[in-house]
Amino acid sequence: RPEQVLAPIYGSAWRYRHRARLSVREVAKKGTVLVGFHEKRSSFIADMKSCEILPKRVSDLLVPLRELINSLSLRKKLPQIELAVTDEALALVLRVLEKLTADDEAKLRQFQKDYGVDFWYQPKGPDSIYPMDPENATRLKLHHRETGVEVVFRPTDFTQVNHRLNEVMVTRALRLLHLEPSSKVIDFFCGLGNFTLPLATRSAKVLGIEGSTELVDRARAGAKDNNLADKTEFEARNLFDWTLDDWDAVWNKLGGVDRVLIDPPREGAMALCRSLADTDKRPARLVYVSCNPATLARDAALLVREGGWKLLSAGVMNMFPHTAHVESIAVFEPGPKPEKIDEIDEIEIGGMTEEAEQETRSEEPKI
């Protein structure tokens, strides 16, 4: 258990979801196209005309968008629309299985003009997206007002769906790390730099490590855009096969590490936590942000029981109202490492060794 339970963080229960994936299906019996979420535990698409968890701008667009899709010749070849909205822009990514006709494209351009949106096309996988109007597409940005950082992202990039609570979460993580101007920090699973760039405004050096080479390249570009290139470095590494040697290498590269932030996907960070449990080169503070309480509990147990880390505090953030999901945050600092017993010669827990039992039998009287 943590020594302190942090106060939970709540945001608005409504209008919070800034990313969503809408399914599209023509329903002949209704003579129309449905655009919306799937019904609970069903392949059916809800007949949505509004949505209270989407920003009002997006909710108000559902009916006009549905009418637009219904008017397109390729409506049967457009199974999905992914959306991303910020204060500045609304991007709609159309999963198109066929090339658009000139008439369809003209309708999209008129809709884009009338409603102030940016259409993107996705002919294949998520990396294949491109804007319909590259010269005029508005850039999507996450803002961290306390540090002045802006993180630019593409509509299919992973970002937190709740932008306001993401900003609060980043601020809380910075404060829990107890950063100093001389701090050397590693941000594991750094993505586009959601934590890395704000961390760099309060530290001497931040190393962001991420599995995707493309995200690392764009995180570097983000650091340059925010005038933080001289305080940041980025590496593309597979963090699921991280070893103690890898930890030693980054420790030596930075000349020591004062703080660590871990923000893994649902799978957690077992290999990374194993190295932090085994090493004698330990940072002064570790903050672990998690979207999966089960893997956080597993990794925390590894750090505490095998590495001697102390769980100072932990808390939750209601990042996803009206769902069963929760975002958690935990703070650790080094404690005394447990003693390791390599070999027990005479007595084992729960009974005697085989050698001791044999000696006892040899001393029993013969009858």
Residue ranges and their predicted role:
Residues 11-17, 81-87, 186, 192:
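Feature of Fe-S/electron-transfer and energy-metabolism proteins
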Residues 99-367:
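Rossmann-like S-adenosyl-L-methionine
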Residues 15-21, 32-34, 78-80, 89-91, ...:
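Broad gene-expression machinery/nucleic-acid interaction feature
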Residues 43-49, 90-93, 153:
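Short small-residue beta-strand/loop micro-motif enriched in glycine and branched aliphatics
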Residues 84-97:
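Carbohydrate-binding surface patches
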Residues 5-13, 80-83, 124-129, 315-320:
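Short, solvent-exposed loop/turn elements at beta->coil junctions and helix N-caps
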Residues 1-78:
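Extended interfacial segments that mediate partner engagement and assembly in macromolecular machines
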Residues 23-27, 84-86, 333-335:
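Short beta-strand micro-motifs enriched in acidic
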